[in-house]
Amino acid sequence: MTCYRLAKRRDLFAFPYPIAIWRDPPKSVEIVRNLVADGGFKHIYTVGDVVTRNFLEYGLIPTSAAVDEKTRRGIRVERFSAFRSVVEVVNPPGYITDEAWSAVEKAVEGGVVVKVRGEEDMLSLAFIRLAPPRSIVAYGHYMGALIAIPVDWYRRDLLKLFDFLEKC
């Protein structure tokens, strides 16, 4: 069973790791598109409703995505048809439940939307750990930046964040 709970040092998880793009869409999506092309990346995983919607709207279709249908801006992802399947899971705030972890394991294979009842934020760590080589994980930072993580470049360092999670 794989379940993690954020118990301490929440501040470390709010830090804008490692490429923060402080531009509004479509420019932010264009920057990631260029990063993908220039870096030879093959997979893009988005975490969050606004990021996923922006990628879809501006033609950069994620390999898979995780959404919770709750945003500060009231934006909903409506183009689930861009994906082969939708997997619904329960994942409370500050957790990566076993159910959510299993859904991300399926999602890294491609074509899956993980639709979360609860909160999807922590699933970015699951994507970082499970994504295949040549992947980018993208999510929105609460202060407005688009965060893009080239997994091969940063995985080892970012996985140290698991040291601050408790097994549940």
Curated annotation (Swiss-Prot):
Keywords: Coenzyme A biosynthesis, GTP-binding, Kinase, Nucleotide-binding, Transferase. GO terms for biological process: coenzyme A biosynthetic process. Its EC number is 2.7.1.237. It is an enzyme of class 2 (transferase). Pathway: Cofactor biosynthesis; coenzyme A biosynthesis. InterPro entries: GTP-dep_dephospho-CoA_kin. The keyword Kinase applies. It catalyses: 3'-dephospho-CoA + GTP = GDP + CoA + H(+). Pfam families: DUF359. One of its GO terms (molecular function) is kinase activity. GTP binds at residues 49-51, 68, 70, 120. Catalyzes the GTP-dependent phosphorylation of the 3'-hydroxyl group of dephosphocoenzyme A to form coenzyme A (CoA). HAMAP family: Dephospho_CoA_kinase_GTP_dep (MF_00590). Belongs to the GTP-dependent DPCK family. PANTHER family: GTP-DEPENDENT DEPHOSPHO-COA KINASE (PTHR40732:SF1), UPF0218 PROTEIN TK1697 (PTHR40732). This is GTP-dependent dephospho-CoA kinase.
